[in-house]
C-alpha cells in the first residue's frame, strides 16, 4: 500500500489486513534542510515504478495523509493531488485520504500554492476531497475529543461492507 509516509496505527491496520506499506513520499521529506514547500507530496516516479513492479491490480489503494504527521506536519500540494488522481484513474487504483489534519493542509495550499490565495480553506478542502475515493478522519486530533472519527467512501458496496464490520469492531 503506497503512501506519503505513514501514521503508526494506519500502517498497523494495513499490515494486520495483509498489506505491506511502501513509502512513496518525495525525497525532500527526508531532508530537514530542504525548503520544499510541499514535502508531503507523493513521488509519482516512485509510484510508477511500484505499479510496474507489482501491477496495479495488486495495489488496493494509495493512502495520502494531509498533512504528513511523520514528516513533522508537512503538506501535500493541490497540483500533486491532481497529478495523483490522473495517474490513479489511468491505472484503476483508489485514493484514500487521511484527512485528520486537512484544514492545516488546505491553509498551506492557500498560503503557498499559486492560484489559491483568494480561495477559502473550506473550498480548498472540498477540492482536495474531490480527488479521492474515500477518507478517514480521527477525531482525537484537531476535533478536540478523546475518541471517535469517521470513514467516508464513494463506493456504496464498500460502504455497506465497512458498515457491517463496524458492528464487530465498535
Report residues per predicted region.
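Conserved PLP-enzyme active-site core in the AAT-like
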Residues: 1-170
Amino acid at each position: 500500500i503506497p503512501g506519503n509516509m505513514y501514521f503508526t496505527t494506519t500502517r498497523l491496520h494495513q499490515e494486520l489486513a495483509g498489506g505491506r506499506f511502501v513509502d512513496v513520499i518525495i525525497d525532500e521529506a527526508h531532508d530537514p534542510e530542504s525548503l520544499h514547500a510541499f514535502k508531503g507530496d507523493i513521488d509519482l516516479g516512485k509510484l510508477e515504478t511500484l505499479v510496474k513492479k507489482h501491477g496495479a491490480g495488486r495495489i488496493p489503494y494509495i493512502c495520502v495523509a494531509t498533512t504528513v504527521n511523520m514528516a513533522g506536519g508537512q503538506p501535500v500540494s493541490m497540483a500533486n493531488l491532481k497529478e495523483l488522481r490522473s495517474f490513479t484513474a489511468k491505472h484503476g487504483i483508489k485514493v484514500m485520504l487521511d484527512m485528520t489534519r486537512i484544514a492545516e493542509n488546505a491553509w498551506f495550499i492557500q498560503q503557498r500554492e499559486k492560484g489559491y490565495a483568494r480561495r477559502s480553506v473550506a473550498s480548498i478542502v472540498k477540492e482536495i476531497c474531490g480527488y479521492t475515493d474515500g477518507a478517514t478522519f480521527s477525531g482525537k486530533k484537531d476535533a478536540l475529543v478523546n475518541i471517535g472519527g469517521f470513514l467516508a467512501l464513494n463506493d456504496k458496496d464498500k460502504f455497506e461492507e465497512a458498515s457491517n464490520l463496524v458492528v464487530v469492531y465498535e
